[in-house]
Amino acid sequence: MHGQNAQARVWPMLKVRHLVAGALLALVWSQTWYIRTIFPKAFFSVPREMPSWYIRGGESSASPSVTCTPIRSEYVADPQAYETNPSTSQHAQIADACEDLRMSDTLGAVFLSCDPGRKEWNVFMGPTANPASRGALWVLDYKTAPDALPVLVPMEGYPDSYDFHPHGMSLFVYDENHARMFVANERAAASTIEVLDLERSHEWRAQYVRTLQHPVGTHMPNALHAVGPHELYVSNSKLVSHRPPPRASYEAAIAAQLGNFLAPWLYVALTYRPLFHIFSFLDDLLGLGYVSHVRFTDDGDVTHSIFAQRISFANGVVVSGEQLYVAATGAAGIYVYDRHKKAASKRRTYVPLPFLPDNLALTVPSEHRTSPGVLAAGHPSLPDMHLYALYSTPARRAPSWVAEVWYNASSSTEHDEAGVPFPSDRAIPRLPYGWHVQTLFQSSGRHAPDVSAATTALWDPTPQGRGAFFVTSLYGPSPLLCKGMYS
């Protein structure tokens, strides 16, 4: 009798386990494309074929016309900075760990978003140990002063009680001396977007305007693209956060993606630390990242709508004409949307890349190409990047890859990768019709001058811009500036 009761209790448990195992197997089977395409980049080191150094038009090309040097800033005393000036032993800001760069042809300047304290505070990848230090914004006048160094941008009116961990940013330019800047801020309590007005008299200064915060619209803001002084697109990389925001905000973000009924229960599960890495992996596998369309008024109202969702680690975002481009880091490619179509009829084009893309940027149009291309910088190997973040030494460097993406159905892709040591078509499936991917930069991360784990690239191929090409990284030292890289 007792044996029959025990068997009766065990049998339903076995059935539940079989159902769960079957569901997980079905989920994995449904993601076979993900495993075949992303698995090598996500779980293995960089291929041996990756060159120690390649740049278009550089030493390894037929016409070595490109010269590259790191651009080092001076130390600027700041008691809230993470780094220490070795000459004075005082805390000071320096233009290192600059995750994002933004270029404006009108302003003739490149702005840098730098946070050396990211080694101890990173809400996307961890750790989240110490948010006490502050990052800073820098500017480089690359057109008018070709040999200039990055200069710190003073932030006037920014509240002393606010922490500042700048990540992605965007510019809305008014004229050659005025612009509005939006900066994603990985604050200790919850992520926000800081609105700053830039003005240049003799030097650039930033006036704090306000802070944007919305439980869904700014849940985990990574990259930004402003389309007006009160309107921008925001990529929210993940639903699962290393640093959970306040419960009401977190439940609102969960509800927006997975429904109101599950939100309270999932909040408890997602904040249970022993299972965090499992949920974070499922987040990328299921594609719970999304792009928000955020608007605000001078009166303080912030409104939000989800423009695109089901994006595996939504990252860089740019708008070019009628198209919106989103880097899907977890899907090793770029999604392209028509930004004026309604959500119900919105379709996307997937452009695969030979690396895990990070930030995106538009190239400056030139006489050879009237419409800008899209630059994507990223990581050929996720494990190498993680090891570099943990052990930032010359022996632990991470590879980088930068490519330009554009659409032209009337031209062939046959010569796009001519001369590239490790061409992109060896690492990606067939491109959609009309799309081109051309490698501009490759590195194993162990060649000087160099960057490691590139996150952003900018390119001004015009003579006025001296063919300036910038590459920067998440944790690395000063950005790399290459000159003479013309279209």
PLM region descriptions:
Residues 92, 97-100, 107, 116-175:
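Blade-loop segments of beta-propeller domains
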Residues 36-97, 147-156, 205-209, 301-302, ...:
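A short helix->beta-strand "capping" segment at the edge of beta-propeller domains
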